[in-house]
């Protein structure tokens, strides 16, 4: 970060105007390499048949690629695509992914520097900003959901073309060469028929191939989509404060009616009255958001219509109304942050005694519940070959060549991650079933390695060596909350939110 700041200070100009030269700096690719952006190994290793040596990373290939782009202008003006590999030579995926990874690192620099400078100036982040972070979702779930009635489950639509992401990014970064190179990169994949830019799988494929570049482009797009909320909140707040003033201060009632009428004269200001709701809440994580309210079903339908029209008119793409699902909390369960959440109504009767007469009082209570989504998780475990589609554990043959300790460690790490992530669940029965699948799959894998049956293997070694699957989380809880007086098994049934669960992206993204 110090090198980036020094570079921008030498330029003597606005920071985001000079990102393009960073593509030719060695430490950019060393930084991307050290971050381990590719889970299967760094992509910044030059191929032996190209460079003559292995396990080296440099900007030589990037310079060669960019030079070909601008000298030949192959992608834009070429009519004959009979030799699609001509542009990149030996390996088109290697070159293209390499330059895109470097570009993703560079795009993050202005935002990182902005955060660092704000921290240096203010020394402390205001609490109002903290409440808008991802960590504020958990107390919001606990404290607010049980008091609300309606929910809109929203899937933020993707734009029809990647060019729209470039145009939105242009509002943040005014470096023309970098944006032009990004356009060429997208056009390159389009000409080759790469699946990441086909109409149906544009963004899904890009998020899998290059997640860092995907989120660098997608986050400004989401900020743009949500900008309307800030505008409506300010306008609605202004109208609401004016309205309350006219009611409470009766001595100046008629004097304030005139400017109040002028404020609402505009047609759009009148439309805002339809969306005034002091109990409206909006929460988002990545591409999924929820809009909850204590209002009526009519109000939620107006919000839905407004969203669809806003996306179509402002972003020029078709948004299907089915992407916004409206339902009552008591009749609807929704997926968010990897949980299946709901607010069921629990009716109960209380007997009241007054003198010699007694009567029953019907009481309705609502409690926010978070449940482990057992079916999607079993589907994910089935794809990873830990069980079949019915949830029956099977061995993991690809791990049979590892040592016993490595096998147990891998299964234990998966189990601990699941326990850690779903500790906020109000019902742990499904989590116990997932642990059972992993535990028995581990036993089957070890038995397969030693050419034995599971029963004989457990009888010979005992089942204690697998107990860490169930005891690790209890040990952590006993260290965090040592003063709890009631038994630990009751504590483990309590709902506990860990603020670092968003790092386990596979669990938040598989739903």
Swiss-Prot record:
Its main location: plastid. The keyword tRNA processing applies. Pfam families: Intron_maturas2 (PF01348), MatK_N (PF01824). Transmembrane segments: none annotated. It is found in: Plastid, Chloroplast. It comes from the Eukaryota. The keyword Plastid applies. GO terms for biological process: mRNA processing; RNA splicing; tRNA processing. GO terms for cellular component: chloroplast. InterPro entries: Domain_X (IPR024937), Maturase_MatK (IPR002866), Maturase_MatK_N (IPR024942). GO terms for molecular function: RNA binding. Usually encoded in the trnK tRNA gene intron. Probably assists in splicing its own and other chloroplast group II introns. Belongs to the intron maturase 2 family. MatK subfamily. This is Maturase K. It comes from Pistia stratiotes. The gene is matK.
